[in-house]
């Protein structure tokens, strides 16, 4: 994502986070703005990278990658946010995008999925199971599952 596309990504991220936050915390007010204190760091901090998911040249979603493991364990890369826009879902694009993202960094990866998001739970289980990764494990927590795996 180029710097001049930052506002477009922010709009997509906000829309995604509003829906996602409503899944995770049903008590919050629907449509309440989201707070992303590290958003600007994706263009200035080493290890943070924003990417578009493209379909035929059209923006079909985004991936935010950083090095901050949800488990607190050491990792080389983590999927911070991942979104395929609704019009592009159920076409295999998300799985292909996840696999391409995993190829961006060699080493230990992590991502977390909230249990309140069963579609996301199923998606990530399939995406990881079909990816060229090793040592895939899950850390089950009360409200979420953390996936860990290695890429070569």
Features from the language model and the residues they span:
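Conserved acetyl-CoA-binding loop-helix of GNAT-fold acetyltransferases
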Residues: 84, 90-103, 122, 126
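A short, internal acetyl-CoA/4′-phosphopantetheine-binding micro-motif in the GNAT/acyltransferase core
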Residues: 79-90, 113-115
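A conserved beta-turn-beta hairpin within the catalytic core of GNAT-like acetyltransferases
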Residues: 68-80, 89, 107
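Active-site rim helix/loop that mediates acceptor-substrate recognition in acyltransferases
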Residues: 26-50, 54-55
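Charged phosphate-binding loop/patch that engages nucleotide di/tri-phosphates or the phosphate backbone
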Residues: 135-152
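Conserved beta-strand-loop-alpha-helix junction that forms the acyl-donor binding cleft
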Residues: 110-125, 129, 138-142
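Conserved beta-strand in the GNAT
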Residues: 50-52, 58-68, 78, 83
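A short beta-loop-alpha structural element at the N-terminal edge
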Residues: 1-12, 17-20
